[in-house]
């Protein structure tokens, strides 16, 4: 299993959130999630300007096996999307925590970040899933 970056927060549904220096939140799916899905063939991105709600579907990733909603870890407004994923969805498979980010949110309430799992708690969740 790959290393879980220490600067990320997670949802139990395997999305990650990186708090940027400008207060925005970058969102993607975990390396564990992309591994379960297999080779990704399509990503449905949210629109810039869309309002997303914590825990609601904001994007969709599709593999040869299944389509899966990507839930937003925070509420706010989408300010940027990774349009490169339209042509290269496999970027998520190759670099889930880096170039494979999906969208960026201007967060409504920073307190929501306190409800997310830290990397150690997320690693524990993955271990529990395997047993």
From Swiss-Prot:
Record keywords, A-Z: Lipoyl
GO cellular component: cytosol; glycine cleavage complex
UniProt cofactor(s): (R)-lipoate
All residue ranges annotated as the Lipoyl-binding domain in the record: 24-106
UniProt protein name: Glycine cleavage system H protein
Function statement: The glycine cleavage system catalyzes the degradation of glycine. The H protein shuttles the methylamine group of glycine from the P protein to the T protein.
InterPro entries: 2-oxoA_DH_lipoyl-BS, Biotin_lipoyl, GCV_H, GCV_H/Fam206, GCV_H_sub, Single_hybrid_motif
Residues making up the signal peptide according to the UniProt record: none
The organism's taxonomic lineage, starting at the top: Bacteria, Pseudomonadati, Pseudomonadota, Gammaproteobacteria, Lysobacterales
Pfam family, one: GCV_H
Cofactor note: Binds 1 lipoyl cofactor covalently.
Entry superkingdom: Bacteria
Keyword rRNA-binding belongs to the record: no
Family as reported in the entry's similarity comment: Belongs to the GcvH family.
GO biological process per UniProt: glycine decarboxylation via glycine cleavage system
């Amino acid at each position: 299993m790959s290393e879980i970056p220490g600067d990320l927060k997670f949802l139990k549904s395997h999305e990650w959130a990186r708090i940027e220096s400008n207060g925005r939140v970058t969102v993607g799916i975990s390396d564990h999630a992309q591994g379960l899905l297999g080779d990704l063939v399509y990503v449905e991105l949210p629109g810039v300007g869309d309002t997303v709600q914590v825990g609601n579907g904001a994007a969709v990733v599709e593999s040869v096996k299944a389509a899966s909603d990507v839930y937003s870890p925070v509420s706010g407004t989408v300010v940027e999307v990774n349009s490169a994923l339209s042509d290269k969805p496999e970027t998520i498979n190759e670099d889930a925590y880096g170039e494979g980010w999906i969208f960026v949110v201007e967060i409504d309430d920073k307190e929501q970040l306190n409800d997310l799992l830290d990397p150690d708690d997320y690693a524990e969740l993955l271990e529990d899933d395997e047993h």
